[in-house]
Amino acid sequence: MTVKTPVYLDYAATTPVDKRVAEKMIPYLTETFGNPASNSHAFGWEAEEAVEKARADIAALINADPKEIVFTSGATESDNLAIKGAANFYKTKGKHLITVKTEHKAVLDTMRELERQGFEVTYLGVQENGLIDLEELKAAIRDDTILISVMWANNEIGVVQDIPAIGEICRERKIVFHVDAAQACGKVPVDVEAAKIDLLSMSAHKVYGPKGIGALYVRRKPRVRLEAQMHGGGHERGFRSGTLPTHQIVGMGEAFRIAKEELEQDMAHYRKLRDIFLKGIEGIEEVYINGDLEHRAPNNLNVSFNFVEGESLIMAVKELAVSSGSACTSASLEPSYVLRALGRNDELAHSSLRITFGRMTTEEEVQFAAELIKSKIGKLRELSPLWEMFKDGIDLNSIEWAAH
């Protein structure tokens, strides 16, 4: 089996631009280069037409109205605009916000910033499977709660929360509901109407579109108000000023159009690859799947291999492009805060691999990856004194280690 290495299995970090998307973008760099806001000539009109077509394609994937789509530079900006924008607009009603400990840093750090500004934030824990307890969420709601932010699919463990149920709770209590859907679009069905979502963050580069472009869905009925975070020429109905990058927007629109058209086959492809991988690592002892396998984005696997050091594991499988933790925070040596929130100990949190499949991943590549990981785990454990002790039946938790 000849597989070209390194094999890219880090699609949750980013995806290559689909060739169909790249082709669609090129004319808007050199030919149809007008500013979409120039409304006095054909160059501007053509660019605006392309932007509106993309807006409609993006809206279609999430079952929204095109007028509800606001272009941003990516999901991080969308999260900032949604959370800061809503918190500041509705702060006269109350200053209490609710989110989850396993959210992306773009949400958590935005919440921290709002705490510095005098807001109060409740960070909900998760169960061992990564799902929040809806009763706990209900109990956390107060009369002064104005916003709840819960991600659709987790970037590290792929766990999919019960978004429609949370949407129901928020609508009933008239609380603004924000959802970070960067990892959900194109991987699971997303419907903002059915799920009663008020604000939804999206990114193009997680869906085979270009980097540097994203969008925020802002509900019109019932209308959700935001305070702008970027001031200027009043573009995007005043929500987000700045000249629209037509080529990027066209790319995102085409990527989302394809994602809607090919969602079923993409999902089936991911499930098949996931099953092949899980079958391939069967028989390795002390393997823990992190996060619920049922309620999960089909392209994500996060696996901890006990008695193996995470960093040495990444080095050992250098023919695979995989990650430990998310790409945004994998530079730090701290164990993943997401895995810690599941109750995993430091050792298991440190020995995790996030393997995420994509549209271009082949069955051969996944087979190769599973076999490689299996053989390397065996070799690394042979070198581990802890593994030897574990195999000898020694309870490692009962050992008193001498301090040096």
Swiss-Prot record:
Its main location: cytoplasm. Belongs to the class-V pyridoxal-phosphate-dependent aminotransferase family. NifS/IscS subfamily. Its cofactor is pyridoxal 5'-phosphate. GO terms for cellular component: L-cysteine desulfurase complex. It catalyses: (sulfur carrier)-H + L-cysteine = (sulfur carrier)-SH + L-alanine. It is found in: Cytoplasm. The keyword Transferase applies. The modification N6-(pyridoxal phosphate)lysine is found at K206. Master enzyme that delivers sulfur to a number of partners involved in Fe-S cluster assembly, tRNA modification or cofactor biosynthesis. Catalyzes the removal of elemental sulfur atoms from cysteine to produce alanine. Functions as a sulfur delivery protein for Fe-S cluster synthesis onto IscU, an Fe-S scaffold assembly protein, as well as other S acceptor proteins. Its EC number is 2.8.1.7. Keywords: 2Fe-2S, Cytoplasm, Iron, Iron-sulfur, Metal-binding, Pyridoxal phosphate, Transferase. One of its GO terms (biological process) is [2Fe-2S] cluster assembly. This is Cysteine desulfurase IscS. [2Fe-2S] cluster binds at C328. Pathway: Cofactor biosynthesis; iron-sulfur cluster biosynthesis. GO terms for molecular function: 2 iron, 2 sulfur cluster binding; cysteine desulfurase activity; metal ion binding; pyridoxal phosphate binding.
